[in-house]
């Protein structure tokens, strides 16, 4: 089934095959089903171009997991979920799941084609940005143990940045991901560490009570600043490519924006699902 969706997406993307070929992703290097003990990806890609494979690769894995779940006995065809929620690029998984449940093969192919366009556009625009690097910094950093308000103040306090910094994902009240250029994120981490050091000094001097600030910052292993204004040009490129391929313009823009430029508020999404009547949540992973 997954291989069929990928093959169908090749046909959808025929009008932009030449553009995708410049990034060597006009045909995905996936072997499905993969031989026992082997991975499905037959060609390694590093740097920003990794997104051109990882975005559709994740969607393929999500669809495969959904199919496995139904074969294991969860009848989502007969007992359709109250709601679907996708974290970050999980919105693509949500849309392809809806298409698969509805038996709409054309829509499933279009959604998978969009995943390929989103990954390719993100990779191309990030590479062209030539953002400065700094040590082990990447394009996204996880920040735990810092409130919404404090993190916003620290981001806004930075004197200057080479590219826009944005709080890309709110995973909890004190767990966030910030997107931006690597050198700017390195400056942000240093600023957070200075604030934490000042807070510790105030506690040690008995000038402040309560729980001390103990932030944990970890660079994510990504080469693209998802959910960032830095990818506004990538969104425009997806719109352009989707129009050439005859993909529904509203669908293309909404899904691409959700992955490329729109911030994620995960607690708000879960609250919305609960308000729709959901009482059980089946976590499809990763790590589930």
Map each language-model feature to its residues.
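Acyltransferase/transacylase module recognition
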Residues: 1-81, 225, 229-288
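Short, hydrophobic alpha-helix immediately C-terminal to the catalytic nucleophile
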Residues: 63, 94-95
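Alpha-helix C-terminal capping segments
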Residues: 68, 72, 95-100
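Gly/Ala-rich beta-loop-alpha elbow adjacent to hydrolase catalytic centers
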Residues: 82-90, 94
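Glycine-rich beta-strand-to-loop/alpha-helix junction loops that act as flexible
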Residues: 87-89, 181, 284-286
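Alpha/beta catalytic cores of group-transfer enzymes, especially the acyltransferase/condensing modules
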Residues: 96-254, 258-261
């Amino acid at each position: 089934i997954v291989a069929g969706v990928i093959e169908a997406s090749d046909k959808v993307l025929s009008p932009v095959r030449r553009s995708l070929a410049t990034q060597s992703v006009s045909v995905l290097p996936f072997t499905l089903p993969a031989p026992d003990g082997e991975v499905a990806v037959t060609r390694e890609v590093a740097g920003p171009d990794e997104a051109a494979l990882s975005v559709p690769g994740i969607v393929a894995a999500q669809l495969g997991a959904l199919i496995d779940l139904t074969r294991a006995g969860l009848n989502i065809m007969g007992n359709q979920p109250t709601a679907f929620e996708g974290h970050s690029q999980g919105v693509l998984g949500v849309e392809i799941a809806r298409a698969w449940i509805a038996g709409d093969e054309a829509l499933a192919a279009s959604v998978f084609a969009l995943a390929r366009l989103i990954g390719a556009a993100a990779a191309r625009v990030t590479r062209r940005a030539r953002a400065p690097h700094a040590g082990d910094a990447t394009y996204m950093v996880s920040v735990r143990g810092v409130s919404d308000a404090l993190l916003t103040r620290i981001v806004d306090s930075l004197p200057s940045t080479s590219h826009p910094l944005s709080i890309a994902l709110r995973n909890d009240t004190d767990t966030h991901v910030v997107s931006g250029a690597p050198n700017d994120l390195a400056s942000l981490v240093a600023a957070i560490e200075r604030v934490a050091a000042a807070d510790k000094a105030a506690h040690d001097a008995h000038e402040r009570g309560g729980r001390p600030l103990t932030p944990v910052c970890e660079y994510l292993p990504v080469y693209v600043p998802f959910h960032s204004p830095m990818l506004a040009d990538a969104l425009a490129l997806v719109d352009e490519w989707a129009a050439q391929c005859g993909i529904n313009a509203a669908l293309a823009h909404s899904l691409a924006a959700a992955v490329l430029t729109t911030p994620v508020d995960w607690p708000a999404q879960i609250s919305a699902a609960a308000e729709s009547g959901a009482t059980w949540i089946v976590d499809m992973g990763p790590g589930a």
